[in-house]
């Protein structure tokens, strides 16, 4: 009897597990079964992938030589400074500050102290470009001892 019960129970438990596994499978299929919109999206994606994969590169027979490179608009001779005048870089921000402050006041009509750090650095990069191209007046290259910093008049007595 014990053996009969155990075999019957085994059959029942198998039937239950088969039922539950089949229902699990159906739920998964239902979850993954998309709408027509999903199918359209998938087909569009695959079309895009196909288009991307069919791009062609130029053949190796049409290699360009060094002579085919486009000419630069400006040569290095366009930017040559006079003898003895060094080129500036952004590292010269503090050493050429008097010249920069004078240029700001005269060219941009603004004072150095009125600018934020970022704005001053941006304008200094413009100043450096003009300096390196030799577009500034000669007095900038000769050196400026003092420069206007603010619009404030300090009213200090001079003797």
UniProtKB/Swiss-Prot annotation:
Top-rank taxon: Eukaryota
Keywords of the record: Auxin signaling pathway, Cell cycle, Cell division, Developmental protein, Nucleus
Compositional bias annotation for Basic and acidic residues: 15-50, 64-85
Region (Disordered): 1-86
Listed InterPro entries: SCI-1-like
GO cellular component: nucleus
Consequence of gene disruption: Increased cell number in upper pistils leading to enhanced stigmatic structure. Impaired siliques formation. Reduced expression of auxin-related genes.
GO biological process per UniProt: auxin-activated signaling pathway; cell division; cellular response to auxin stimulus; gynoecium development; negative regulation of cell division; regulation of auxin mediated signaling pathway; stigma development; style development
Keyword check for NAD: no
Biased composition range(s): Basic residues: 51-63
Compartments, as annotated in UniProt: Nucleus
PANTHER family in alphabetical order: STYLE CELL-CYCLE INHIBITOR 1 (PTHR34117:SF1)
Stated role: Component of the auxin signaling transduction pathway that regulates cell proliferation and differentiation during flowers stigmas and styles development. Involved in the regulation of auxin-related genes.
Name of the protein this chain belongs to: Style cell-cycle inhibitor 1
Gene expressing this chain: SCI1
